[in-house]
Amino acid sequence: MNNRKTPRIRFKGFTDDWEQRKLGEIYARSGEKNDGSVGIDRNITVATMQFKDDVKVSTTEYLKTYYTFNVGDIAFEGHQSKEFRFGRFVENDIGNGIVSHIFAVFRPIVEYDLKFWKYAINNERLMQRVLSRSTKASTMMHDLVTDDFLNESFLVPTIEEQRKIGDYFSHLDHLITLHQRKLEKLKLIKKSFLEKMFV
């Protein structure tokens, strides 16, 4: 059993233990429905965290069954995969929108760093213990038991340390994206030269 209250690697200047907090002290279930003022152009697909307006809805009235999904909110997607055995949470960092009522949406109720929590709640190593005890298996996916989820505990750093960690991983993702683009460009150049430099 790991009783550590601090990570093995930390940024300089941070020495305090991380605080044990119930997730119900950080998030509350949001049941806020779309009042009809948000159109299908603001529909967010949880699987890819993108706006997707080509969803078929029978009527504009049906859009009122959708939940509002604001920046900082998290939603549970119960599909299991090799990477996420019990499903996963995703955080909205793309803009205010709406999601289907099939997703459980939670809203932060304390000050927190958006970037830090994006990485924390999508970290299978951290969330596996939480989700294994707060989900139940159904056909092809897991259902979240809200009360069990909100009763689970999580070690949380100060807001200052959250910001430092969130910024660090956000910067790494930015660098990865830049290098992936360069790699794709080099692959295209190679393909072009392979076609043109041989007779």
What are these regions (language model features)?
Residues 1-199:
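Feature detects amphipathic, helix-rich regulatory segments
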